[in-house]
């Protein structure tokens, strides 16, 4: 069997909820041995948003595949001793507790690197150093303070959260990049290092084009935005692409909530598009023929396209536009996505067996490595690997394991 990309890398996963588990799950998919350390009562998401009684929720199972689970009360003295040994044996340690929580356990960065000078210690917090450092953050808080919400929505409406989990899972991806870079640098230096990623910072990185436009505003209105008024900050612009090529979501038949196709109008696409919508004369009309001429009339342009698209189902609109190499995509509902044969074939929508809840559907790995294929396996039951890790790897005796359990240490 082919060795995995991160085979031999041991990850001590002290994360919970979403931002941290999304990162460590990616590491597990890449072949790392990820040991999820949970309090004896377990990660809170095991019981959150349950769809079935008395089993791990989808919230938990979909973020913790391919991991092992151990339980440990890190507030107890024996728990701290065991945690010390786990740190000593690990290549990577990841946590996303509230600010200062791990330090208060007695495991500051100075202490951690004293235990294991080669360890890469990654932390996720809401904010960087400064006035917000001690503040708690959740997904939408990070969106609010990272530039996403103020620029999402329509001009005359309130700021909106995006459905994409850019604050949590988006931060997780950034953490993985930092961990991999630190592991690579360790090959040259022989020592580990601290990796810190703030959720606000990760969201801002994903919103950088809006910071670009903030600076462009000083030179005049943003012509590619459909907005009528511009102040001194980047406005919400609905479904406008905000890029060099204008785009919009146009309605399709029969008019359901997701009967839309997003269309990008490139310069080369205007001539075939004008023919498709039954207005071939616009390809030569100087009022419409060039991107510069169309720019002040983007709303009218997409209105003309919608007059055509609204008479056809979105899949037919997709087919006709793609026949002319016009960039577009139908708005897919979550039901359509979970039933999409191509996503199943690409192992992006995968069915995973679970020992208690039966099969569940989850997202597969978007990272496709030719020499390190991913097989998504079930999330672990709470403490499922206690004996395997504590007895088989740390060398504790069976009797001590029983005492640890009866005394609430594990």
From Swiss-Prot:
The pathway it acts in is: Metabolic intermediate degradation; oxalate degradation; CO(2) and formate from oxalate: step 1/2
Q: What is its EC number?
A: 2.8.3.16
Tell me the function of this protein.
Involved in the catabolism of oxalate and in the adapatation to low pH via the induction of the oxalate-dependent acid tolerance response (ATR). Catalyzes the transfer of the CoA moiety from formyl-CoA to oxalate.
Give positions of region: Disordered: 221-245
Q: Which residues constitute the catalytic centre? A: 168
* Catalytic activity, reaction form: formyl-CoA + oxalate = oxalyl-CoA + formate
Which SUPFAM superfamilies does the record associate with it?
Answer: CoA-transferase family III (CaiB/BaiF)
Q: Which cysteines are joined by disulfide bonds?
A: none
In this chain, substrate is annotated as bound at 243-245
Protein's recorded name = Formyl-CoA:oxalate CoA-transferase
Keywords of the record, alphabetical order, are: Transferase
Q: Which gene encodes it?
A: frc
Q: How does it assemble?
A: Homodimer.
Cite the binding residues for CoA: 18-19, 72-75, 96-98, 104, 136-139
Q: Which domain of life is it from?
A: Bacteria
Among Pfam families, the record links this protein to: CoA_transf_3 (PF02515)
């Amino acid at each position: 069997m082919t060795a995995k990309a991160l085979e031999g890398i041991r990850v001590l996963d002290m994360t919970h909820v979403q931002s941290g588990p999304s990162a460590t799950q990616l590491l597990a998919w890449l072949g790392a041995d990820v040991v999820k350390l949970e309090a004896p009562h377990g990660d809170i998401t095991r019981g959150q948003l349950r769809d079935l009684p008395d089993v791990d929720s989808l919230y938990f199972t979909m973020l913790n595949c391919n991991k092992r689970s151990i339980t440990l009360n890190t507030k107890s003295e024996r728990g701290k001793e065991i945690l010390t040994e786990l740190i000593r044996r690990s290549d990577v340690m990841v946590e996303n507790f509230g600010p200062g929580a791990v330090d208060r356990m007695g495991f500051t960065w100075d202490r951690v690197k004293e235990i294991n000078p080669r360890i890469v210690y990654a932390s996720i917090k809401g904010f960087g150093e400064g006035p917000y450092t001690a503040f708690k953050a959740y997904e939408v808080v990070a969106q609010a303070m990272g530039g996403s919400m103020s620029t999402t929505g329509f001009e005359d409406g309130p700021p909106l959260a995006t459905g994409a989990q850019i604050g949590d899972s988006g931060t997780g991806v950034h953490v993985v990049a930092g961990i991999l870079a630190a592991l690579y640098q360790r090959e040259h230096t022989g020592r580990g290092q601290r990796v810190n990623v703030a959720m606000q910072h990760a969201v801002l990185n994903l919103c950088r084009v809006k910071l670009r436009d903030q600076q462009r505003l000083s030179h005049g209105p943003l012509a590619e935005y459909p907005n009528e008024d511009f102040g001194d900050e980047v406005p919400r612009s609905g479904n406008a692409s905000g890029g060099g090529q204008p785009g919009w979501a146009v309605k399709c038949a029969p008019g359901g909530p997701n009967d839309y196709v997003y269309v990008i109008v490139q310069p080369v696409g205007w001539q075939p598009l004008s023919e498709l919508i039954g207005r071939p004369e616009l390809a030569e009309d100087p009022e419409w023929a060039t991107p510069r001429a169309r720019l002040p009339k983007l709303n009218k342009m997409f209105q003309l396209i919608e007059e055509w698209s609204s008479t056809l189902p979105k899949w037919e609109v997709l087919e006709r536009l793609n026949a002319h190499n016009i960039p577009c995509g139908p708005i897919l509902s979550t039901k359509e996505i979970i039933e999409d044969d191509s996503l199943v074939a690409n192992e992006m929508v995968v069915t995973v067996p679970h020992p208690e809840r039966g099969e569940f559907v989850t997202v597969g790995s978007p990272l496709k490595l030719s020499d390190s294929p991913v097989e998504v396996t079930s999330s672990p039951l709470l403490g499922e690997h206690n004996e395997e890790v504590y007895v088989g790897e740390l060398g504790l005796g069976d009797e001590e394991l029983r005492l640890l359990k009866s005394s609430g240490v594990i």
